[in-house]
């Protein structure tokens, strides 16, 4: 890469008054991984941009084609438990029928996989449906709980083995009722009274243990001024919860977020990632002829199916009551299949999981309310939900002042053969640090999840650990997904 291409960008950044910062305001990164999924680390960008990545289809993960599942199955959770992937979802063949009609019976179903790609249904023999127990249902006939039961793997230190799995489900009438399990299949009610009340809860309500905040966090459904909203509450013991607080979204427009699907990101658990369903009531996309061709009026007793649409968006949080919506555009679009332009199609499952050495997956419902209803797997590069992107014309990114612990800096990055990345350390005032300047850096021209940055003197940066510094990146035809300081 020609360094002269960067001179103008470098001078503009260095001369900008906003690069001056107080050392006491430094971000304390320690040795953790940071994703470029928001502007948390970024102070200035010139000739580069923060871009949302688009997932690729990994094919069908599961078809909802069993008698106890069907066209309105939903509220899917995928958990990675060691080398086993566990999937939970509501099974319900049809809607719009009486509670005593088997077509409207709701059950909680369980499937599993060893690779996160192909899921199978174990015959568990726990629940009778249609005169047989040969099915994968684990809960049934418990009021509103099986409408939206959402388990999680409790990672709190010291949690009893008998409560390694927890889950909640319910409605505004019942509150959120908690269940526990040792094996993720046999669930028992934790207590008779609900653990959380005061919400609408008529969606998927997600709980997890946050190492970052040292508490359980629950994100649940409420309404605010007629808009489907997300509210949060916390607890240190899972029994006693703080007064709920509505989440804020900064300057983002108020949109119906039907599900939040929020959990701690598995490679950087201080970052919460939500793959939310964005619902557009009364926004009809299908013409009358298209409705007729899809036979939607015959598919299910649900008139709204043809009148509404939905897609998926990205939410992030670093704790507290604020969601960041850096990217307002869709994370997942309905696509060219007309069957996905119906109400409640394109609802993501909760859970982003590792499905390969350089791949992670999310899952999304397709063809909701129709006989072809299925769950699709979508893949990202590991850490690759978003990236700082430079085109062929070089650009720069400057971080805020930070401190770190460690002796090496690694980047999750990708470049073309023509492109690459250079890295410079600066002091808090923006002055390049001798030995770690751009001129000293060995160009990173590669595609790697953890490429170590080196300078003429080597890769050891331990002399800078604990000191307030900035990182300056020069980039050409490259993407920067994440960085990590390694001890």
Residue ranges and their predicted role:
Residues 3-7:
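N-terminal export leaders
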């Amino acid at each position: 890469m020609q360094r002269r291409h960067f001179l103008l960008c470098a001078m503009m950044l260095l001369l900008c008054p906003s690069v001056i910062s107080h050392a006491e305001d430094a971000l304390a990164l320690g040795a953790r991984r940071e994703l470029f999924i928001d502007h948390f680390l970024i102070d200035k960008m010139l000739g580069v941009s923060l871009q949302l990545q688009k997932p690729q289809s990994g094919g069908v993960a599961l078809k909802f084609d069993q008698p106890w599942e069907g066209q309105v199955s939903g509220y899917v959770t995928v958990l990675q438990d060691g080398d086993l992937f566990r999937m939970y979802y509501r099974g319900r063949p049809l809607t719009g029928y009486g509670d005593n009609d088997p077509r409207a019976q709701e059950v909680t179903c369980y499937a599993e996989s060893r690779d996160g790609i192909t899921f199978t249904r174990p015959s568990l023999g726990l629940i009778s449906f249609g005169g047989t127990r040969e099915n994968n249902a684990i809960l049934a006939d418990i009021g509103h709980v099986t409408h939206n039961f959402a388990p999680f793997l409790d990672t709190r230190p010291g949690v009893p083995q008998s409560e390694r799995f927890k889950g909640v489900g319910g409605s505004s009438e019942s509150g959120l009722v908690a269940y526990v399990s040792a094996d993720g299949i046999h669930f028992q009610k934790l207590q008779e009274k609900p653990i959380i009340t005061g919400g609408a809860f008529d969606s998927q309500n997600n709980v997890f243990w946050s190492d970052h905040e040292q508490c359980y966090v629950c994100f649940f459904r409420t309404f605010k001024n007629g808009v489907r909203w997300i509210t949060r509450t916390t607890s240190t013991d899972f029994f006693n919860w703080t007064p709920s607080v509505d989440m804020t979204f900064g300057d983002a427009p108020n949109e119906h977020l039907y599900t939040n699907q929020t959990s701690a990101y598995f490679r950087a658990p201080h970052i919460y990632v939500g793959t939310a369903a964005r619902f557009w009531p009364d926004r009809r996309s299908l013409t009358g002829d298209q409705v007729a061709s899809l036979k939607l009026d015959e598919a299910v007793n649900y008139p709204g199916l043809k009148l509404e649409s939905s897609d998926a968006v990205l939410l992030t949080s670093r704790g507290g009551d604020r969601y960041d919506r850096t990217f307002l555009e869709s994370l997942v679009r309905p696509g060219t299949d007309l069957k996905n332009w119906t109400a409640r199609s394109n609802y993501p499952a909760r859970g982003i999981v590792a499905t390969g050495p350089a791949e992670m997956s999310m899952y999304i419902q397709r063809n909701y309310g129709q006989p072809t209803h299925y769950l699709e797997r979508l893949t990202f590069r590991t850490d690759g939900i978003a990236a700082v992107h430079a085109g062929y014309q070089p650009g720069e990114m400057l971080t805020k002042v930070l401190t770190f612990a460690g002796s090496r800096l690694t980047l999750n990055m990708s470049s073309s053969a023509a492109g690459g990345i250079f890295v410079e350390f600066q002091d808090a005032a923006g002055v390049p640090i001798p030995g770690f300047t751009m001129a000293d850096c060995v160009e990173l021209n590669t595609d790697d999840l953890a490429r170590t940055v080196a300078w003429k003197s080597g890769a050891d940066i331990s002399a800078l650990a604990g000191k307030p510094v900035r990182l300056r990146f020069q980039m050409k035809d490259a993407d920067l997904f994440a960085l990590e300081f390694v001890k």
